[in-house]
């Protein structure tokens, strides 16, 4: 899980979602693409 000021999609499988006020990126194809804004 990367914590970044600005989260971006890194591949076409990445999805940007918002959970409890935190913007996250989840990726089914590449778990290393997981990010959250912070």
From Swiss-Prot:
Keywords: Ribonucleoprotein, Ribosomal protein
GO BP term (any one): translation
Keyword Ribosomal protein: yes
Keyword Transcription: no
Record-annotated membrane-spanning stretches: none
A GO cellular component annotation in the UniProt record: ribonucleoprotein complex
Gene Ontology molecular-function annotations: structural constituent of ribosome
Signal peptide: none
Family: Belongs to the bacterial ribosomal protein bL36 family.
Protein name: Large ribosomal subunit protein bL36
Organism, as annotated: Pseudomonas entomophila (strain L48)
